[in-house]
Regions:
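Flavin-dependent oxidoreductase catalytic core characteristic
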Residues: 1-30, 47, 57-58, 65-66, ...
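Catalytic cores of large soluble enzymes that bind and process phosphate-bearing ligands
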Residues: 4, 8, 12, 37-40, ...
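Active-site phosphate/pyrophosphate- and oxyanion-stabilizing loops and adjacent acidic/basic residues
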Residues: 18, 77, 144
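Short secondary-structure junction/hinge motifs that connect adjacent elements
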Residues: 27-51
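Short, hydrophobic secondary-structure boundary micro-motifs
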Residues: 27-33, 61, 115, 128
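Conserved short loop/turn motifs at secondary-structure junctions
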Residues: 32-40, 64-68, 99-105, 131-134
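Internal helix-loop-helix
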Residues: 46-123
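Glycine-rich, Trp-frequent "lid" loop and neighboring beta-strands that shape
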Residues: 68-69, 110-153
C-alpha cells in the first residue's frame, strides 16, 4: 500500500524522526528489538512512556482533553511507523489502551482526574486478571450452560 503524504506530513515525519534520534538510547532500542509479545520489558516500556509523556506524545489515540495529541490518523500512522523503524520499545497497552478508554467512557470526573494522568505519565501500571468460580485463571476450562426457567434461561 502506498500512502500519499503532503508537505505537512513529511515535516511531521522529520520531527518524529529527529525526536526519536535524540531520545532513544541504545538501551531502549535494544529493548525494542528484543520485544517478543505485545509490549517491551516493563522497565524499558515505562522509561520510554515517561519520555513520550514529557513531550506530550504518550497517548496519540486519546482525546486532547485527556492528554492526547490531537493528531490525525495519518500522523498517528507516521508516528507508529517511525517508532517501529527506530526500534522504539512498545508501550504496555493495558493502561493506555484498555483501562483508560473505559475510565474515559464510564468513569466519573473524580476517577478521570485521578487515574488518567497517572496512567498517562506511567506513574501507575495496570494489568488485568481473570478468575472464575471452579476455573480460577484457567479460562479455557470455563463451562457454561443455560437452564430453562419458564420463558427465559
Amino acid at each position: 500500500m502506498h500512502l500519499e503524504t503532503g508537505k505537512a506530513d513529511q515535516a511531521f515525519r522529520e520531527e518524529v524522526a529527529d525526536f526519536l534520534g535524540q531520545h532513544l538510547s541504545q538501551e531502549l532500542r535494544q529493548a525494542g528489538r528484543r520485544t517478543m509479545g505485545i509490549c517491551s520489558p516493563h522497565e524499558a516500556s515505562q522509561a520510554w512512556q515517561k519520555i513520550l509523556y514529557a513531550k506530550g506524545w504518550a497517548a496519540p489515540s486519546w482525546p486532547v482533553e485527556h492528554g492526547g495529541t490531537g493528531w490525525t490518523p495519518m500522523q498517528r500512522h507516521i508516528f507508529a511507523t517511525e517508532c517501529h523503524l527506530a526500534d522504539a520499545p512498545m508501550l504496555a497497552p493495558m493502561g493506555l489502551e484498555m483501562v483508560a478508554p473505559a475510565i474515559m467512557g464510564h468513569g466519573n470526573e473524580a476517577q478521570k482526574s485521578f487515574y488518567l494522568p497517572r496512567i498517562l505519565s506511567a506513574e501507575d501500571s495496570w494489568c488485568q486478571g481473570y478468575s472464575e468460580p471452579g476455573s480460577g485463571s484457567d479460562l479455557a476450562s470455563l463451562q457454561c450452560r443455560a437452564d430453562k426457567d419458564g420463558d427465559d434461561y
